[in-house]
UniProtKB/Swiss-Prot annotation:
Function: Hydrolyzes pyrophosphate formed during P-Ser-HPr dephosphorylation by HPrK/P. Might play a role in controlling the intracellular pyrophosphate pool.
Protein name in UniProt: Pyrophosphatase PpaX
GO cellular component annotations of the record: cytosol
EC supergroup of this enzyme: hydrolase
Catalytic activity: diphosphate + H2O = 2 phosphate + H(+)
Record SUPFAM superfamilies: HAD-like
Organism: Listeria monocytogenes serotype 4b (strain CLIP80459)
Signal sequence residues: none
Residues spanning the membrane: none
Enzyme Commission identifier(s): 3.6.1.1
Pfam families named among the record's database cross-references: HAD_2
Family: Belongs to the HAD-like hydrolase superfamily. PpaX family.
InterPro entries for this protein: HAD-like_hydrolase_sf, HAD-like_sf, HAD-SF_hydro_IA, HAD_2, HAD_sf, PGP-like_dom2, Pyrophosphatase_Ppax
Encoding gene, per UniProt annotation: ppaX
Cofactors (names): Mg(2+)
Length: 217
């Protein structure tokens, strides 16, 4: 792919904001409520970060998947603002991209309202022109639907776009949409895990994006 990058699409959790402890704690409490006889360690829960809730709960406990999702969301929202953290340098890098007139969007497997809450808590909401949540698409990542919807709303093409994320769902979704892709080295599963999905770039820090988009010009 050649040409100028004008459009940057981001995953939210684990990419722009650190919700790892919130997610792990919420899963632990949910599993304790519905499956008290089974112990889920932190390592057991890591693979559940990234896929949609229903994908996870249907695999673990299909008979109670709907109830578990409702319980998870209630607990998650209640403790959301207390447990999310900012990643160093993210705000400054996103602000710089915004000020240089790049088109910025979010494509997440979270519900729209929850995405907006996280963005507002961290002050990032003012920088993103398009936000695509799970409740706005029929098919979650790695299906390209969310990316394609965001590109359409931003009046951008796949040739000028890059998808940035911390999970294989993000990289695969970008590849399926035929955009460039970037993994983040601060992913909770580690850069080695992401590297096996062969993103075009691996970011050591969010400001690395500035050099990437400028080099593409």
């Amino acid at each position: 792919m050649t040409g100028k990058i004008t459009t940057l699409l981001f995953d939210l959790d684990g990419t722009l904001i650190n919700t790892n402890e919130l997610i792990i704690k919420t899963f632990q409490v949910t599993f304790q409520e519905f499956m008290p006889d089974r112990v889920f360690t932190r390592e057991d829960i890591l693979p559940f970060i990234g896929p949609s809730l229903m994908e996870t709960f249907r695999e673990i406990n299909p008979a109670h998947a709907d109830e578990m999702r409702a319980f998870y969301r209630e607990y998650n929202l209640k403790h959301h603002d207390d447990l999310i953290l900012e990643y160093d340098g993210v705000y400054e890098a996103i602000r710089a991209l915004y000020e240089e007139d790049y088109k910025l969007g979010i494509v997440s497997t979270k519900m729209y309202d929850t995405i907006m809450r996280g963005l507002k808590v961290t002050g990032l909401d003012k920088f993103f022109q398009v936000v695509i949540g799970l409740d706005q698409v029929s098919n979650a990542k790695p299906d390209p639907e969310g990316i394609e919807m965001a590109l359409s709303l931003l009046n951008a093409t796949k040739e000028e776009a890059i998808m940035i994320g911390d999970n294989y769902h993000d990289i695969e979704a970008g590849k399926n949409a035929e955009t460039l892709t970037a993994g983040v080295a601060w992913a909770i599963k580690g850069p080695e895990h992401l590297a096996q999905f062969q993103p075009d770039f691996m970011l050591e820090k969010m400001s690395d994006l500035l050099a990437i988009v400028r080099d593409e010009e």
